[in-house]
UniProtKB/Swiss-Prot annotation:
One of its GO terms (molecular function) is oxidoreductase activity, acting on a sulfur group of donors, disulfide as acceptor. InterPro entries: Interferon-induced_GILT (IPR004911). The keyword Transferase does not apply. Residues 1-35 form the signal peptide. Belongs to the GILT family. One of its GO terms (cellular component) is extracellular region. This is GILT-like protein F37H8.5. It comes from the Eukaryota. Keywords: Glycoprotein, Secreted, Signal.
Amino acid sequence: MDTTCRCLLTPTIQPVLLKMLYRLVAAILLLGAVQATINCAAIPTSLWCSNKDLEAKCGFASFCDKHRAATHNQKINITVLIEALCPDCQNFLTKQLYPIVFKNFANYVNIELVPFGNAKVLEDGTIKCQHGEEECSINKFEGCFIDSMQDQSPLPTLSCIEESLQKKVEFADAVQQCFEKLQIGGDIQRLTQSCLVSKLGADLQNKAAAATANVWPEQHKFVPWVIINGVSLTSFQGFQNQLPTLLCEWYSGDKAIPYCEAALKLKYKKASIRSFF
């Protein structure tokens, strides 16, 4: 009987294919075991909406759909509690918030500055500031300037002034130099000056005091203090220097933020170089 057409594996090929089959079966069994044993309650909340399969398996889908609907193409609100002569506030404004966040994320965030910080409103209504009377005067000026700028961002000018103060430039000189450098118009200058000598200046300081006291759900413990979308958390403050990275993670829109794309490409490039060597 002719047996040349039997459907048998040749001796040289059979072990290879069997090994591949064993590996495939093992992978399927392992995947099933991982899926069966995953503890959804132990997954960090920041990862809940990062993968559709994860959302479906752990029951996160409904929450994630609501989150996406509420945040898609929406600017992220950043509120920063500051005080004028605080070195850490000056560093944050001049080295992080203005040169990195504002310049690269201006179309994706709303930035609000609250110049009051650790000051206290005394029983007689006067305000006592952590770094003395000069700080109170500058806080008041910054509040008036912010109000006078209306729809324009005060951050470039305030960052300029704070950088000058870091260099021990007199406040009046710093204001004049920065107004000239950033071409602040006469109307805004007059509005700011009028605010300083009127009841409005005091009202704005009291408003800043109330805004600082009423942050939620946790009170500020130091400055600068960063609040994201109205939420004040002590645990977040340790990540102030990672704010650009977090904004890249949090923002959800039709188009990626150019800064984030560039940062990701640079990261992959560095990783490729390391893996090559």
